Structures are given as structure tokens and as C-alpha cells.
Amino acid sequence: MGFWSYYKEEVKVIRDRDPAIKKDIEAILYPSFWAIYNYRKAHKLYEQGKVFKARRISQRTARKTGIEIHPGAKIGKGLFIDHGHGVVIGETAILGDNITLYQGVTLGGTGKEQGKRHPTLEDNVLVGAGAKVLGSFTIGRNSKIAAGSVVLEEVPPYSTVVGVLVKRNDEAVPCYDLDQVHIPHPVQNELKRLSDENTKLREMIDQINNKIKE
């Protein structure tokens, strides 16, 4: 796609989703305009096996725009990244058509595993500011991820996801494996401990009742 064809498409995308734009020419002032344009060039090189050239383009673009899109990611038409600073899209991420991302969004992996390790977003998904979607699973079409949410598992189509899974955890966990997902959950651990104690108490009560009956 030539520059002017891209420009016309991007103007339409921005006008559809950002009321702040007043004139078409403003599109070139959006960081996402250049981030996505350069991603398309880098992705083509990446597919041709010219990995170093592709990575060089993506890293230079990340420094200039604050948006890091790995050239290996697969992205459909109509991606809109509003504001954009701090957005990260990983190597094996797959994005459908008409995706909207806000600043601070991470579409990341869960550690050092190989193969598909980043999320798949189907058509018309919106991911709010600061949301983190980590792992190899699918966010169903027409779903919305609320700002600040942390998503670690599959989301069905036409869903709304709200909330942060992060809780304070006092258990020591090794950080050298780069695993962001398989971390002991303090609330779940506490519930299990209480359940185990409850089971023991019931057993003690049953023993006492049996002795009384004797």
C-alpha cells in the first residue's frame, strides 16, 4: 500500500474514533499514524526473512512514537491506537480488523516459552488504557476490556471485562524465569487454608460427637 492510500484509510479510522481531530491533515500528527505505517513496512520485511531490517525499523519507531509493535505481529485493517504512549504488541500477537487500543496497553507473553505466546484479538475489540492482556488465548469479537484490567484467560465474544487480578503476595517467587502469570495468588491460597482448617474442625467435632454417643 502506498503512502497516500494509507493516509486516506488512516484519516477515516481516526475520524471514526477520535472526536478531537478537526482537519484531515492532523492525522500525521498522531503517533499511531507513523507507528502503524512503519509496522506495515517492517512486517513485510519480516515476512521476507529480513528480520534485522524489520527490527531496526520497529525499534526506531518505538523510540520516536512510544509505541512498540513487533514486526512479527499480524494486524488486520483499521487498527487505531489513541494517544499510544506505552503500547506494546508482542511478536506472536494477532489482531483482527477494527481494533482500538489506548495508551499503556500491553499485548504480551507470559515468560520465555516458544511458539504462540501472545493474545489473539478478534474483530472490533476495544482495550482500555493501561490494560494488560498476557498469554496465548483469544479475546472474542466485539469485546471490551476496561481500563486498567489484567486479563489472563479467554474472553468470549460480546463480553465486557473489568478488574485487576493483582493482589499482594508475600510468598517468594523466582523472577529469573520471566513468568508473569503463574504466580501464587494470596486470596486463593488463604481460601484453601481456611477450607483445610474447616475440614479438620469438622473431623474433630465428629470424633467428639462419636465419643459422647459411646
Question: Predicted regions span which residues?
Answer:
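Terminal amphipathic alpha-helical/low-complexity segments used for targeting or macromolecular assembly
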Residues: 1-65, 175-214
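Structural signal for interior beta-strand "rungs" in well-ordered beta-sheet cores
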Residues: 62-169
